[in-house]
Amino acid sequence: MDQTTTYYTLGIDIGSTTVKVALLDQDLHIIFSDYERHYANIQETLAGLLKKALNQTGPIDIIPVITGSGGLTLSSHLHVPFVQEVVAVASALQDYAPQTDVAIELGGEDAKIIYFTGGIDQRMNGICAGGTGSFIDQMASLLQTDAAGLNTYAKDYKAIYPIAARCGVFAKSDIQPLINDGATREDLARQ
């Protein structure tokens, strides 16, 4: 690597439902970040995000790194370093939010938790996508809103209903009859 060239770090996260990019300057300040759903068009979505970044920054020299559940294959095809997702999140939090005790990361189809106190301990759900981003999207769609709308509705809840907590399919099966019985969006969003 040329010592006189200014390099920027490009982080690429290829998830099960979205592509995320972050461009950092040499002082590790974020100068561009964005994400989009890829709808199974990962390469096109990534190309679009990179074009947006280039339009904002102009031509620059980058050092890319890839993470995410869908990133390993792309990493090997492009000969770009791959960092396991939980390692990338833990590393970023230690740099940007060193006071963090516990971090929860909801992916499209998985959920991860990282404990920092007393050493780093990482855990991941392994049973079902219940409680993940895809599940939240499904519930938002069922209630004819988006994820932010669920938060808005939940602020005004009046009742809590028993909903399956371990499986997204069972939770959806619990929610549909509640909708049919007239449960409010506010109450269902709180679940």
Predicted regions and their residues:
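Short beta-strand scaffold segments in enzyme catalytic cores
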Residues: 19-24, 110-116
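Short, well-ordered amphipathic alpha-helical segments that serve as non-catalytic structural scaffolds
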Residues: 42-56, 93
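Short beta-strand-loop/turn "lid" adjacent to the catalytic site in phosphate-handling enzymes
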Residues: 28, 35-38, 53-87, 114-123
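Short glycine-rich, Thr/Ser-proximal phosphate-binding strand/loop in the N-terminal lobe
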Residues: 6-44, 48, 121, 126
